[in-house]
């Protein structure tokens, strides 16, 4: 468990639920279940599945209630919390040369500027994560709760190049976490955002070759061209791909698709639709 103290404020109670019967009210805090601090929604769902549980609730006046509950294994308590994840979203620690959010115009709604890099959102919403802020504790929970598939933004398997592209000196070492997930039997999907003159050409071939080592748990890898907008003042200089560039990229991908299909019976590496539209 992390050093952070987790107190989950009750937002609402379902009428006729176990929670209502026990006198739990909006504004109360859930402190623990069976003596275990609850980090997020995954801990909560795991512990409330038991037929016999003990809740520690702190009322709004500070009084703590220990509530012993007997219920059916699949019966919910009827508690809704203020945050769907029951925790803060984890933000990105990178400064990627290709970051699309950095290229957005001003004046849009605040949520569009939030850079998430949260493995839990990868499971819940299909978001891609870079692994740079994933701790050993996070990996253990992913394996324990089978939070799969995890969608990973690889960009490259060259550690030095990955550090450069993500502008994070830990980005290369973060690739070792893929081994942990693989050893834990976790299914994954991958993505490579291709930047002209950076991770294409021989580097793309290296990445595809390296990633085949994780088949069958790494189910697929998509290759997409970097998205560039006109709002790039002060950002890393990147050139857009041309039609001829797209032909070269597709040639590499199709070559590896044939090789991988012959060996594994799957295509594995896939080109984004954008390549065919250039």
Residue positions per predicted region:
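PDZ/PDZ-like peptide-tail recognition elements
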Residues: 1-8, 20, 46, 54-59, ...
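Short, structured beta-strand/loop micro-motifs enriched in basic residues and often containing a Trp
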Residues: 6-15, 35-38
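Terminal peptide-recognition signature
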Residues: 19, 27-30, 55, 99
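Conserved PDZ fold ligand-binding element
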Residues: 21-39
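Conserved Radical SAM active-site core
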Residues: 63-67, 71-217, 227-256
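Hard-cation-handling environments
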Residues: 240, 247-278
């Amino acid at each position: 468990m992390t050093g952070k103290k987790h107190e989950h404020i009750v937002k609402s109670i379902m009428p006729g639920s176990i929670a209502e019967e026990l006198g739990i009210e909006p504004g109360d805090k859930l402190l623990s279940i069976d003596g275990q601090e609850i980090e997020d929604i995954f801990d909560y769902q795991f512990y409330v599945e038991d037929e016999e549980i003990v809740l520690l609730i702190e009322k709004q006046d500070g009084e703590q209630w220990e509530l012993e509950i007997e219920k059916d294994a699949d019966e919910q308590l009827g508690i809704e919390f203020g945050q769907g994840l029951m925790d803060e979203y984890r933000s990105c620690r990178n400064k990627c040369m290709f970051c699309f959010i950095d290229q957005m115009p001003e004046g849009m709604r605040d949520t569009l500027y939030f850079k998430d890099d949260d493995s839990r959102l990868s499971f819940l919403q299909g978001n891609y994560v870079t692994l740079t802020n994933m701790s050993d504790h996070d990996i253990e929970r992913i394996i324990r709760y089978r939070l799969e598939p995890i969608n990973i933004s690889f960009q490259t398997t060259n550690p030095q190049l990955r550090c450069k592209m993500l502008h994070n000196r830990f980005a290369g070492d973060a690739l070792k976490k893929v081994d942990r997930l693989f050893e834990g039997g976790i299914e994954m999907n991958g993505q490579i955002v291709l930047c002209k003159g950076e991770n294409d050409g021989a580097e793309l071939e290296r990445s595809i070759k390296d990633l085949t080592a994780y088949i069958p748990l790494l189910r697929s890898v998509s290759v997409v061209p970097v998205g560039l907008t006109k709002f790039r003042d002060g950002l890393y200089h990147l050139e857009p791909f041309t039609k001829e560039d797209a032909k070269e990229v597709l040639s590499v991908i199709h070559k590896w698709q044939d090789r991988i299909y012959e060996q594994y019976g799957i295509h594995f590496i896939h080109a984004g639709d954008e390549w065919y539209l250039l």
